[in-house]
From Swiss-Prot:
InterPro entries: Formate_THF_ligase (IPR000559), Formate_THF_ligase_CS (IPR020628), P-loop_NTPase (IPR027417). ATP binds at T65, P66, A67, G68, E69, G70, K71, S72. NCBIfam families: PRK13505.1. It catalyses: (6S)-5,6,7,8-tetrahydrofolate + formate + ATP = (6R)-10-formyltetrahydrofolate + ADP + phosphate. Its EC number is 6.3.4.3. It comes from Staphylococcus carnosus (strain TM300). This is Formate--tetrahydrofolate ligase. PROSITE patterns: FTHFS_1, FTHFS_2. The lineage of its organism: Bacteria, Bacillati, Bacillota, Bacilli, Bacillales. The keyword ATP-binding applies. Pfam families: FTHFS. Keywords: ATP-binding, Ligase, Nucleotide-binding, One-carbon metabolism.
């Protein structure tokens, strides 16, 4: 049986004018800033605030395969299923980054009949937010280099500049560069480098800000580098926070689109979860909570990355808590964690599924450690067999875990109704939300609590360089920040090839990066890169555009 591609399904869908979607959810006309017929930004200052706030459902996943387990698809399908059940629901998602779109993932707007539209636009530039973030980031880099060129009044040490330029593309050649070459009129030569835009602190700040005032204050707090006597230099010292916030004045407004079934969706911000905090913007989530009774949102990768940071960073900053969580699992991911090679994941292997359940179980335990009850969404693929699915369902029943076979890729919202009903049950229960650590703990203890309580490790070690950075963090009074772990998404450890649910391991912290604008400390582990590279056969090889301007190959 031949299935339509995600792009074909999206192109065949009937999409409503965005003004209709806005009216349905209660957004006044003067708050809607349309970008064509099917996309808009929302001026949150013009929304009526009735005081009520919707309940948040967080969608996370088990440790994924390289292809992903369909978390965005399940998020969209679950929202559509709530809509099918008559609930007043919205979803709040991250924007796709162009680098991964052209790299290994292709499009990132859900899949099958559980997609957000217009799919082409969202995957390619959307409403210009990433361009604005890239511009603001690189404007700051230009201001820094210009300050040094014009006499360096602040005494910035060129060897200790922490701010890098960014690009919304996977480009390994730009990880390390030299700028300022060409003589006295071309600037001051120094080593520099590029990150991908989603790793920019500007991206994180936009996603953690509650408004323009908060955005500008956070930008002012960014530490761009140090003087020769190792005193921090901030954006406030350069006096350019106003200019940078001005560049972002429209980007901070959340973007309104819709699913194939007409469910409203706010898509805003897109930090990665393995190198940043991996959640959409607080502004989008809070806007959805003002407008809907249920808000379905997602956090990148598994409970050890995006969900952990959602709980300990985003929810803490925003002052809300999730009322339920969904853990997306797939038969293929279970088999991978049960020892099956990537090329054999489509072959039936009941024992491997059984062995891989240890990984899923740890993710369930992680969600419960926050005082939130999870529901497992077993996301169906055509290669799954009844025997494999039965193993998972029997295990869930034996362990008291709610589970629903989820077929939203094939059936849209109707394929997620059972999942939505299970989540409804959880939403009606009381829960006692808690964080993994208190903010007044030392940085090293916060990291240790994440490693032992979330990853299942037994020890944390710091390189000599990280220990020096830890000392500097304490001297500068930054040790009351939360921690943002930069770690592989494929394993609970810092080794991407150590799958399953190991418990006899240590995590090595090789670098600590204070993100004083965003308000957290990044702890880098393993071989995590903040500028990815493209694979040998990037998804771009299958992409094209027709003579009438329609994209091809966006999955």
């Amino acid at each position: 049986m031949t299935h339509l591609s995600d792009l074909d399904i999206a192109n065949q869908a009937t999409i409503k004018p965005i003004s209709e979607i806005a009216e349905k959810i209660g957004i006044p006309e003067d708050a809607l800033e349309q970008y064509g017929h099917y996309k808009a930004k929302i001026d949150i200052n013009k929304l009526d605030d009735k005081g009520d706030r919707g309940k948040v459902v967080l969608v996370t996943a088990m440790s994924p395969t390289p292809a992903g387990e369909g978390k965005s698809t399940v998020t969209v399908g679950l929202a559509d299923a709530f809509h099918e059940l008559g609930e007043n629901v919205m979803m709040a998602l991250r924007e796709p980054a162009l680098g991964p779109v052209f790299g290994i993932k292709g499009g990132a707007t859900g899949g099958g009949y559980a997609q957000v539209l217009p799919m082409e636009d969202i995957n390619l530039h959307f409403n210009g937010d990433f361009h604005a973030i890239t511009t603001a980031n690189n404007a700051l880099a230009a201001f820094i280099d210009n300050h040094i060129h014009q006499g360096n009044e602040l005494g910035i040490d060129q060897r200790r500049i922490e701010w890098k330029r960014v690009l919304d593309m996977n480009d390994r050649e730009l990880r390390k560069v030299v700028v300022g070459l060409g003589g006295p009129t071309q600037g001051v030569p120094r080593e520099d480098g590029f990150n991908i835009t989603v790793a920019s602190e500007i991206m994180t700040i936009l996603c953690l800000s509650t408004g323009l005032k908060d955005l500008k204050a956070s930008i002012a707090n960014i530490t761009i580098g140090y003087t020769r006597d190792r005193k921090p230099v901030t954006v406030a010292d350069l006096k350019v926070e106003g200019a940078l916030a001005m560049i972002l004045k429209d980007a901070i407004k959340p973007n309104l689109v819709q699913s194939i079934e007409g469910t409203p969706a706010l898509i805003h911000g897109g930090p990665f979860a393995n190198i940043a905090h991996g959640c959409n913007s607080i502004i989008a989530t809070e806007t959805a909570r003002k407008l809907a009774d249920i808000v379905v949102t997602e956090a990148g990768f598994g409970s050890d990355l995006g969900a952990e940071k959602f709980m300990n960073i985003k929810a803490r900053k925003a002052g809300f808590e999730p009322s339920a969580a969904v853990v997306v699992a797939t038969i293929r991911a279970l088999k991978m964690h049960g020892g099956v090679a990537k090329d054999d994941l489509k072959e039936e292997n009941v024992q491997a599924v059984r062995d891989g359940l240890a990984n899923l179980e740890r993710h369930i335990e992680n969600i419960r450690s926050f005082g939130v009850e999870p529901v497992v969404a077993l996301n169906a693929f055509v290669s799954d067999t009844e025997a494999e699915e039965q193993v998972v369902e029997d295990w869930a029943k034996e362990h008291g875990v709610r589970i629903a076979l989820t077929e939203v890729w094939e059936k849209g919202g109707k394929g997620g109704v059972e999942l939505a009903k299970q989540v409804q049950e959880v939403l009606n229960e009381k829960h006692d939300f808690k964080h993994t650590y208190d903010l007044d703990l030392p940085i090293e203890e916060k990291i240790e609590k994440v490693v032992t309580n979330i990853y299942g490790g037994n020890k944390v070690t710091f390189t000599s360089g990280a220990l020096k950075q830890l000392k500097q963090i304490k001297e500068n009074g930054w040790d009351n920040y939360p921690v943002c772990m930069a770690k592989t998404q494929y394993s609970f450890t810092d080794d991407k090839d150590r799958l399953g649910a190991p418990d006899d391991f240590e995590i090595t912290i090789r670098e600590l990066q204070p993100k004083t604008g965003a308000g957290f400390i990044v702890a880098l582990t393993g071989a995590i890169m903040t500028m990815p590279g493209l694979p040998k056969k990037p998804a771009a090889l299958n992409m094209d555009v027709t003579e009438d301007g329609h994209a091809k190959g966006l999955f």
